[in-house]
From Swiss-Prot:
Deamido-NAD(+) binds at residues 129, 162, 169, 260-261. NCBIfam families: nadE, PRK13980.1. This is NH(3)-dependent NAD(+) synthetase. The keyword Nucleotide-binding applies. Mg(2+) binds at residues 51, 154. The gene is nadE. InterPro entries: NAD/GMP_synthase (IPR022310), NAD_synthase (IPR003694), NH(3)-dep_NAD(+)_synth (IPR022926), Rossmann-like_a/b/a_fold (IPR014729).
Length: 268
């Protein structure tokens, strides 16, 4: 399933020179992070989506295939196509990878707490946190660093599991809007079917990012760039982007409600 075509309210793509500079900066960041940690390699969860695929390409391009260990971690709600895509990415790049089923871990929880078995959010977040545990188990055993796959749109809207998919050592594409991730992915040679695939966290059945967030990523990017990062008032943002004010409010509310995810745990 591909992401629906949308007309972006704002073009945030880089110029050719800016794209080359940003790609070089990210790849140098990956190299420097690994060196600073004194690590031997990187560990990356592969979902078959654009974000993890882009990070995989960046890492292999900079450090070589031997420096990256991929983990494909399917669960009961994972689409077969996504898992096949994840394995295809690993094989195309020539990296070592393992497939680890996460349901046996999650089932241990629902067996002990059966009343929670029907709680989509609790079980879905447990899936994300289980993947984080597996990432770090492999990284600790192999003297590696865990690479994150989060982008700026996800970070600023809180569209991730706390201590789950953002439990990582670094986020190579963390300062890129989703539109920019797509642009970088194409520049890296990521297959077009992965670039245009509808994003999903696959925390529960038939979940899509746009369906859960209520706004498509191009619009989220635009509101974040103009209103949250740019500081333009909400009403002026709606006028500038020619979108309904309620859309700006939705993105602003997502940003506000997720501030706790972007902060260290409070202490008295």
């Amino acid at each position: 399933m591909s992401a629906p075509d949308t007309v972006s309210p704002l073009d945030l793509r880089f110029s050719a020179a800016e794209l080359a500079e940003r790609r070089d900066r990210i790849q140098s960041f990956i190299r420097d992070t690994v060196a600073a940690a004194g690590a031997e390699r990187c560990v990356l969860g592969l979902s078959g989506g654009i974000d993890s695929t882009t990070v995989a390409h960046l890492t292999v391009d900079e450090l070589g295939a031997d420096a990256l260990h991929g983990l494909v971690m399917p669960g009961a709600v994972s689409r077969d196509q996504n898992m096949s895509d994840a394995e295809r990415v690993a094989e195309d790049l020539g990296i070592e990878y393992d497939v680890v089923e996460i349901d046996p871990f999650v089932t241990q929880l629902t067996d002990v707490f059966p009343d929670a078995a029907g709680d989509e959010v609790a079980v879905g977040n447990a899936r994300a946190r289980t993947r984080a545990v597996i990432n770090y188990f492999v990284a600790n055993h192999g003297d590696g660093v865990v690479l994150g796959t989060g982008n700026r749109a996800e970070a600023m809207t809180g569209y991730y599991t706390k201590y789950g998919d953002q439990a990582v050592d670094c986020n190579p594409i963390g300062n890129l809007y989703k539109m920019q991730v797509r642009q970088l992915a194409r520049d890296l040679g990521v297959p077009e079917d992965l670039v245009t695939k509808a994003p999903t966290a696959e925390l529960w059945a038939d979940q899509t990012d746009a369906g859960e967030l209520g706004v498509d990523y191009d619009t989220i990017d635009a509101v974040l760039a103009v209103h949250v990062d740019g500081g333009l008032p909400a009403s002026a943002t709606a006028t500038h982007l020619d979108i309904d004010p309620s859309v700006v409010e939705t993105v602003r509310d997502l940003y506000g409600a997720s501030k706790h995810k972007r902060a260290m745990p409070p202490a008295p």
